[in-house]
Amino acid sequence: MEINVGMRGEVFSFVEKEDTAKEVGCGSLLVYSTPCMIALMEGAACEAIEEAMDESKTTVGTELNVRHLSATPVGMEIRAEAIVTAVDGKVITFEVHAYDEAGEIGSGTHKRVVVSSQKFLDKAYAKL
């Protein structure tokens, strides 16, 4: 199977105390943190193309442009979705969105690159 424009992924999570800006260390309030929202969006992107990936390959995030639009309290459900909008060789571009139970909380674009899992790990650990 190949990666095509229009592929979609969706993931869900509930906001826990450890997901808050205060606990993550990027703010002082007990509201859903931007880093956790971004991680969920990246998870949705991975989900969108998971079935098309060869077992020896993976994707790595290389670019992200996201706006966090609204605060979400602990206890609410979050849904993130990603849609493939372009495929240029090994570079995959996604439109990403996140929602809580009251509406959209984040949106943007995300790029991932297809890599050989083993070669990528070898290169990373060669730094040691």
Question: Where is each model-derived feature located?
Answer:
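Catalytic strand-loop segment that frames the active site of acyl-thioester-processing enzymes
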Residues: 1-32
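Short beta-strand edge segments in extracellular beta-sheet folds
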Residues: 14-16, 111-115
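Hydrophobic beta-strand-centered segment that forms part of the acyl-chain substrate-binding groove
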Residues: 46-79
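Hydrophobic beta-sheet segments that form the core/acyl-binding groove
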Residues: 66-101
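Residue-level structural signal for beta-strand termini and adjacent loop
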Residues: 97, 110-111
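C-terminal output/interaction extensions
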Residues: 113-128
